[in-house]
Amino acid sequence: MFHGQGFSRNRCNVVAVVSGAELCDTNNQIDGTSHQPKYPFPDLSSSGRLKFQVLNNPTPEEFQVAVNSSATDFVYLQGEHSGDSDEVGPLVLGYTDFSTPDALVTLFGSTLPTTVYLELPNGEELAQALYSKGVQYVIYWKNVFSKYAACHFRHSLFSVIQSSCSDTWDVFHVAEASFRLYCTSDNAVLPSNSNRKMNYEMGPCLLGEPPKIDVVSPEADELEEENSLESLPSIKIYDEDVTVRFLLCGPPCTVDTFLLGSLMDGLNALLRIEMRGSKLHNRSSAPAPPLQAGTFTRGVVTMRCDVSTCSSAHISMLVSGNAQTCFSDQLLENHIKHEVVEKIQLVHSVVNSEETKRGFSEPRRSASIACGASVCEVSMQVPTWALQVLRQLAPDVSYRSLVVLGVASIQGLSVASFEKDDAERLLFFCGQQINDTSNHDALLSKIPNWLTPPLPTRKRSEPCRESKEIENGGPTSRKINVAALRPIPHTRRHKMIPFSGYSEIGRFDGDHTKGSLPMPPKHGASGGTPVTHRKAFSGSYQRKQIISLNPLPLKKHDCGRAHIQVCSEEEFLRDVMQFLLIRGHTRLVPPGGLAEFPDAVLNSKRLDLFNLYREVVSRGGFHVGNGINWKGQVFSKMRNHTLTNRMTGVGNTLKRHYETYLLEYEYAHDDVDGECCLICRSSTAGDWVNCGSCGEWAHFGCDRRPGLGAFKDYAKTDGLEYVCPNCSVSNYRKKSQKTSNGGLLVP
């Protein structure tokens, strides 16, 4: 984990010790009448970063062998679950009771894990004993608690660890905020008539120190009075707060400070996880904010920093600080982390507004939001960069931390990892769900404007009919496929929002740009090798638009496909189909498989994805945009092209197909040709032309030779053949060598 604390970066090894009976399965139901909801107990199974080793009633020797042999990061000790009681009992292994501090300490040998979670009643003294023995973090319960509250907290804890590389300190605070939201009787979202709720003081606790971020300069030892944090130059991050509307899984209720405080603490901890594991990829000089420029002292510089978070969300920040800080990559990265994690309250509740004074309105239910469960609306203020992070994490089906907090939608964007069992677990603590249709219709009058339902006369789709039939309790022949109902984004291009008060065009002429963004690893390789980028051209056109070769740090698709220039079309299409299925885009893959893929027609022929992809990546990738002549340079190489073609708008059609089928695939593979313009040596967007002699690419606008035609004359099908300046000189020299005797050609 960060600076040696927490879990390993790639995997978290967990040893789970279950005492008494085995883990409760999903068939367990509350004792009582049949109308009471069933609680789906999750299994302890390996997923994502989590690797579980479950031990049922092990001996102390078996436990120590498991801890020593697997480089254990996390030990989970579960108390007894008796069938006639909902309360969790002490830790009993075989016939030995380990409910005393001395007995529990003897269970651990010389090898200690980073974190121990004691799911045992009255565990404060036990936790103190383990903490004194040397365990960095100990999670425990002060009092007696129910197995339902314990399961909710445990599932929240492991879901956050599964999703991202995180520290125990932040993981605990996300899970503890979820516990306060759904398991305590003080919460206004949850009715207080349920005996399954607990008081907040009875919740889980943590022993341990928060991880520190080292911001000491490597050269500080050589300088006087620079051995402490206070003597080092600090930075300032310029960003604006925006109001964000969240949909939380739960019945509608009235806003109160307890609800807002719990959600605020959970989101703050979640964003701290993302920024604690962030990485600075690029920094460049930038103008100061217009309203702040007059307050800068001498020596203060402003930098535009491109940062990727722990879960590969890409953001851009405008920061200012001392030159020593801003021109050192590692020092600047650590200062940004320190400023965000330890100094700034990222999320703020919306106070003194109309929305906090009136009751919640219940938005219209949707199968793509919390799997059709009831939701309520909450507004919070977050920085602009934090909103970008949350919106990039929401469509990720493997990211479970938002589900832990019950967040089902962010500004209308649904959280893709929300499952039906998640909704049932959260609503279990909310008591009886609101199913009365009259009350539901009355609440529809207060729907937020951004979730206004369609007109009643609009024809409903088949999935909507199936969803409504299930809600009404009608018979259904097959289980609804929730994943197929989720909206499929046409692009996962993470937009980097610049500062609103200035334009990137106005960068300083004396920019000290340092591109430290490493090239992604070669396709199929296990690790990444940094590749030095060509130095960007410093002309005025370059300052207007600088585009990286890999604008989105997406997880690579680990497959064995050959390079795009040598692989076969069948191999390519199979790889694309597999990638789309992994990404959850099942609707793009027809039932017939490869014989029917892709299910798109262009110019009366099946869309030629293979040649479309090859031509685009050979010209710099989709982000080059209009620098590619889609009709003249791409469409003419596809099987869909005909000599008698009379199609209009084919360029926009190809772009839409590429965004739908191939854009994410391009970002997850290293097929983009990173060659630069042979004249200006840059890879920016522009009017690209290909030399017919050497095959190199150049910006047509960079070629200032007289006598050239217009760009459209070279870009159109069967147009003029472009010959670059280098080849023109070479051809002229060859002709000169072949001529003699007054210019007569020697045979």
Curated annotation (Swiss-Prot):
Localization, UniProt: Nucleus
SMART domains associated with the record: ARID (SM01014), BRIGHT (SM00501), PHD (SM00249)
GO molecular function: DNA binding; zinc ion binding
Origin: domain of life: Eukaryota
Alphabetized Pfam families for the sequence: ARID (PF01388)
CDD domains associated with the record: ARID, PHD_ARID4_like
Keywords, alphabetical: DNA-binding, Metal-binding, Nucleus, Transcription, Transcription regulation, Zinc, Zinc-finger
Organism: Arabidopsis thaliana (Mouse-ear cress)
Name listed for the protein in its UniProt record: AT-rich interactive domain-containing protein 4
Zn-finger segments (PHD-type): 674-730
Species lineage: Eukaryota, Viridiplantae, Streptophyta, Embryophyta, Tracheophyta
